[in-house]
């Protein structure tokens, strides 16, 4: 029998799963259809398509983990189950983080303006090497997830301790104690791509500030398209920073949940908050991307007309 908190958790996480799959699936479908029609795909759409596929995987793993915690709270007392879940989560998490970083760096290189030789070289090369960059993201994520699996597999101490525990809650606390260091370490490693995105964000803001100063010197009274592009990219990157911060805090909460008396409630709350990152940022991308937004509006308009008829 589920508690009221468990019922609320299942309802919320199911809703997030549906919205996440629909939102990210919509982006992938639109870009795929456009790719088929035009026989080519832009760099930003190519990065976005890979990103939403990674996010669908991340949302799925997080939802499975959340449901398993509710249905089978002693899952963390079983080495194999924990290793499998954590390995898949690590892979999807890192792949999502690095591809998002690629998207943010791409926005910066394509929108910002600078005369620095390194910037100009990267701006010229980005379209040519994007496939290799994304392949590198996949390789890094796979390597980190394999290392995570090996690290967790090498530590069997919790089996010996858990065998002497009868209470599931005690077993949960004991089984998670050996994983404190690796879990924390792998969470901290995710800061690396975030820092790269943060640097790109501040450099883009600096570029907008310099561009605005130039516009004021030669003001014509009309809206500047370059400024609008700058602002739209900054909004996208700001939403990423906000949702990632929420995601990171939620991950830390779940990592340290074994220290709390209401550990299960802490994990459930952390799961719900964490899924907002791959869900919310993708919805923001739809709103701020002209092509995705216009197609979505047309779909709603056609649906309304069909309902009237």
Curated annotation (Swiss-Prot):
**Compartment(s):** Membrane
Please list the residue ranges that the record places on the Extracellular side of the membrane.
1-7, 72-82, 153-184, 261-266
Entry's Gene Ontology molecular function annotations: bitter taste receptor activity; G protein-coupled receptor activity
Q: Tell me which stretches of the chain form a coiled coil.
A: none
Keyword field: G-protein coupled receptor, Glycoprotein, Membrane, Receptor, Sensory transduction, Taste, Transducer, Transmembrane, Transmembrane helix
- Residues carrying covalently attached carbohydrate according to the record: 167
Identify the residue ranges that face the Cytoplasmic compartment according to the record.
Answer: 29-50, 104-131, 206-239, 288-309
PROSITE patterns per record: G_PROTEIN_RECEP_F1_2 (PS50262)
- Membrane topology value: Multi-pass membrane protein
Something else the entry says is: Most taste cells may be activated by a limited number of bitter compounds; individual taste cells can discriminate among bitter stimuli.
Annotated family? Belongs to the G-protein coupled receptor T2R family.
> What's the protein name?
Taste receptor type 2 member 8
